[in-house]
Structures are given as structure tokens and as C-alpha cells.
Amino acid sequence: MAVPARRTSKAKKNKRRTHYNLTAPTVKFDETTGDYSRSHRVSLKGYYKGRKIAKANAAK
């Protein structure tokens, strides 16, 4: 079983972890529905690229 020969220092550990982060989702304003939605996805009202392609789910 592989075991590290030496303990990893805090600096080395933190330098490795600099890229462990989350990115905010891209959000665009949809002129058809008038609300914001994520890019390249169908809006909650069933629109994609300004065209109605799906039925919207009715909220209960």
C-alpha cells in the first residue's frame, strides 16, 4: 500500500487546492418570457431560443 514518505506541508496542500472552487451558473435575460434563465436550457415556461417547445408545468 502506498504511503507518503513525508507529510504534506500546509503551503503545498493549499497550493494544490487553489482550483477547488465552484463557478456561478451563467444566467441570461429571456426577452420572450421576461425572466432570467440558464443558458442553453429550456425556461420554466417552456421556451428555448424564443420558441415554445414544451408545455409549462402548472404550479399547484
Curated annotation (Swiss-Prot):
GO biological process: translation
GO molecular function, one term: structural constituent of ribosome
Family statement drawn from the similarity comment of this UniProt entry: Belongs to the bacterial ribosomal protein bL32 family.
Residue runs in coiled coils: none
Keyword Ribosomal protein: yes
Gene Ontology, cellular component aspect: large ribosomal subunit
Pfam families, sorted: Ribosomal_L32p
InterPro entries: Ribosomal_bL32 (IPR002677), Ribosomal_bL32_bact (IPR044957), Ribosomal_zn-bd (IPR011332)
UniProt keyword annotation of Ribonucleoprotein present: yes
Organism: Streptococcus mutans serotype c (strain ATCC 700610 / UA159)
Name of the protein: Large ribosomal subunit protein bL32
Keywords: Ribonucleoprotein, Ribosomal protein
Gene responsible for this protein: rpmF
